Curated annotation (Swiss-Prot):
Source organism (scientific name): Drosophila yakuba (Fruit fly)
Gene name, Swiss-Prot/TrEMBL: Sgf11
Family named by the database record: Belongs to the SGF11 family.
Residue positions where Phosphoserine is found in the record: 172
The protein's name: SAGA-associated factor 11 homolog
Gene Ontology biological process terms in this record: chromatin organization; mRNA export from nucleus; positive regulation of DNA-templated transcription; protein transport; regulation of transcription by RNA polymerase II
């Protein structure tokens, strides 16, 4: 058999009007060539040419598809040198990100003020009136309101209040005096002015 009689794939001889062969046709034709020991050289050339043509056509088809779909640049990849350059500018780390601390501000939902993040919790506590001092002020207001209402009841002749209400007022005055004495010592409790 000569090379002109052999079936080829579309790219084997370079002409576009040849009929593409299937793998079963290629295998069957190769088996026929192997039956005769004189044709082994021709069979090996045929097999090599068929495999080479198949690989080349596959690469051409894949490249054409990538070019038409716009993905051909993805084969080139990204140049490695530019991505791994270190930044040597002041106030930037090696990746070019700023190392300076940025002040974080929060907006108070109650009064719509900008407050530093570190001061947001204490501000919100005072702003909403929920802090320790605010609760003390609120309890004093309640005590004065109850005292005023009980005085009003006493003046009307109704004795609805109890003696415990008077005790609360008396004990709170005592606490104030004690706290004033502690503040005179300037917070020092070591020796209370005594020398050893």
């Amino acid at each position: 058999m000569s090379a002109a009689n052999m079936p080829t794939t579309t790219g084997a001889q370079g002409s576009g009007n040849q009929v593409p062969t299937t793998s079963t046709t290629i295998v069957n034709h190769f088996r026929e060539l192997i039956k005769d020991p004189k044709n082994l050289d021709e069979a090996s050339k045929y097999l090599f040419q068929t495999l080479l043509d198949d690989a080349v056509v596959g690469i051409f088809n894949e490249t054409h598809h990538l070019r038409k779909s716009g993905n051909l640049a993805a084969l080139d990849g990204v140049p490695e040198d530019s991505t791994y350059r270190m930044c040597e500018m002041p106030n930037l780390d090696i990746f070019g990100i700023s190392t300076a601390k940025k002040p974080m501000d929060c907006t108070c939902p109650n009064c719509d003020r900008l407050v530093a993040a570190a001061r947001f919790a204490p501000h919100l506590e005072k702003c909403m009136g929920m802090g320790r001092i605010s609760s003390r002020i609120a309890s004093r207001r309640l005590a004065t309101k109850e005292g005023a209402s009980s005085a009003h009841l006493h003046s009307a002749g109704n004795a609805g209040g109890t003696d415990d209400e008077d005790d609360v007022d008396w004990s709170s005055d005592k606490r104030r005096k004690k706290s004033n004495q502690n503040s005179r010592n300037n917070g020092s409790k070591k020796n209370n002015g005594k020398t050893f």
